[in-house]
A protein has these predicted regions:
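A hydrophobic alpha-helix feature that marks transmembrane segments and, especially
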Residues: 97-115
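Active-site cofactor/substrate anionic-group-binding motifs, chiefly glycine-
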Residues: 38, 42-94, 98
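Short, small-residue-biased leader/transition segments that mark boundaries at the very start
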Residues: 2-9
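Cytosolic juxtamembrane amphipathic/interface segments immediately preceding
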Residues: 26-44
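Short cytoplasmic-facing helical segments at TM-TM junctions of multi-pass membrane proteins
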Residues: 111-136
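Hydrophobic alpha-helical membrane-insertion segments
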Residues: 50, 144-158
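Start (N-cap) of specific transmembrane helices in multi-pass transporter permeases
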Residues: 129-150
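Membrane-interfacial helix-loop-helix connectors in multipass membrane proteins
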Residues: 64-87, 155-197
Length: 199
């Protein structure tokens, strides 16, 4: 039983490695039309759920930390703290998790259905490589859209924090915005975008 599990793990790792290698080999023959279709399907259609998730994440985080910072007289750091936390960590991670759930499930269901209905076998019969036709456009679309969506999510999260800090906690809008300029740097956001592309 243990040996069978080990064999199963090795078999899956080998299959995954082979799929990655085949995908890399097929990257030089990208169908741009399919890539744009997948960018719209996987990226643009994910905007509503990313907006809700990051908006409430930024709002709740600001709600939690503002009282503590006000207690210590550090309310002028709220915006900067939110920008750094969202740009470096929370934004890319939350966007990655949301897309893994939504996009991963959608791709799995779509390709699984094609496998069951023998559409993938039909592609092979027509001398069309299923990896190049199905996998590569989705991989390229994700590589392009995830950093864009991560940046969008960071902006939405900071906006959610801005609303809570100014409308609920009574901070001056200029205090929040000046704090962002003072404590955050471009590298905070570029680092987050690099992380999101890896996700």
């Amino acid at each position: 039983d243990r040996r069978q599990r080990q064999m199963c793990i090795r078999d899956r790792m080998g299959s995954a490695t082979l799929l990655v290698w085949q995908t890399i080999k097929q990257l030089k023959m990208i169908n741009l039309w399919h890539v744009f279709q997948q960018m719209a399907h996987l990226g643009v259609d994910s905007l509503p759920i990313i907006s809700l998730t990051l908006l409430f994440a930024g709002a709740v985080m600001t709600l939690q930390i503002t009282d503590v910072l006000i207690t210590y007289g550090a309310q002028s750091t709220v915006g900067g703290l939110m920008a750094v936390a969202m740009g470096r960590e929370l934004g890319p991670i939350l966007v990655g998790v949301v897309l893994a759930g939504r996009v991963g499930a959608a791709i799995t269901a779509e390709i699984g259905t094609m496998k069951v209905t023998e559409q993938i076998d039909a592609l092979r019969v027509m001398a069309v490589d299923p990896v190049g036709y199905l996998v590569v456009p989705r991989v390229v679309a994700c590589m392009i859209m995830v950093p864009i969506l991560a940046f969008y999510g960071v902006v939405i999260g900071i906006a959610g924090g801005y609303f809570v800090a100014t409308a609920i906690k009574g901070l001056a809008p200029s205090t929040y915005l000046d704090s962002i300029q003072m404590f955050s740097t471009i590298s905070d956001f570029t680092l987050g975008l690099l992380k999101s592309s890896v996700f």
